Amino acid sequence: MSLADTIRSSLVPIHREGYRFIAAFGIGSVILGLLWEPLFWIGLLLTAWCAYFFRDPQRITPVDDRLVIAPADGIVSSVGPALPPPELGLSGEFTRVSVFMNVFSCHINRAPVRGRISLIEHRPGKFLNADLDKASMENERNSLIIESPYGPVAVVQIAGLIARRIVCWAEAPGEISVGERFGLIRFGSRVDVYLPREARPRVAVGQVSVGGETIIAEFGSNAPPPLVRVS
């Protein structure tokens, strides 16, 4: 592999949603630099951070209907039974896996399963810290129901304290593949996945999640949730 190919393969693509933000940071840096040169370098660092925030790396997604894949990068903040948002019309408790994204996480959201999108519902709300449990019901959110081979799976994008703009380009009705990009949330947020109770979690609270790659749950398995060790 040539040096040019090595450099090219090391560069992570930037999602189009970030272009105008990066341009604004760049123009602002130049203007501030005209006033005082050190401000230009500070602005340049912020521009680089903005570009890093909107990165859109390729992911290697396991393709198996039994597997549920992480919807986002971040930290698993909760795993356990919970009621889905009422606007989804899903009755009873589901198994919820929540992934919290901080401002340094890649904020592209991906489908955890394949299937038909039967519903997309946006609800206004508060902008509490997305890491709080009550944010699931009180914060602004955008929800999808995916009719998977093992039943309905709900994916909820939740706005956070800083992130106040949810983007979803999926459409209902429509088909979606596991690991497929369907949206993003700007500047720190959370994604909840609600699974039928027969799904067995394969992650623990505090575990690092890689969107489109980490297996967070499995259907058709009687194995208990994994034991974990912090070391």
UniProtKB/Swiss-Prot annotation:
The modification Pyruvic acid (Ser) is found at residue 189. It comes from the Bacteria. Is synthesized initially as an inactive proenzyme. Formation of the active enzyme involves a self-maturation process in which the active site pyruvoyl group is generated from an internal serine residue via an autocatalytic post-translational modification. Two non-identical subunits are generated from the proenzyme in this reaction, and the pyruvate is formed at the N-terminus of the alpha chain, which is derived from the carboxyl end of the proenzyme. GO terms for molecular function: phosphatidylserine decarboxylase activity. It is a peripheral membrane protein. The active site is at residue 189. The keyword Magnesium does not apply. It is an enzyme of class 4 (lyase). Coiled coil: none annotated. GO terms for cellular component: plasma membrane. Binds 1 pyruvoyl group covalently per subunit. Heterodimer of a large membrane-associated beta subunit and a small pyruvoyl-containing alpha subunit. Catalyzes the formation of phosphatidylethanolamine (PtdEtn) from phosphatidylserine (PtdSer). This is Phosphatidylserine decarboxylase proenzyme. It comes from Chelativorans sp. (strain BNC1).
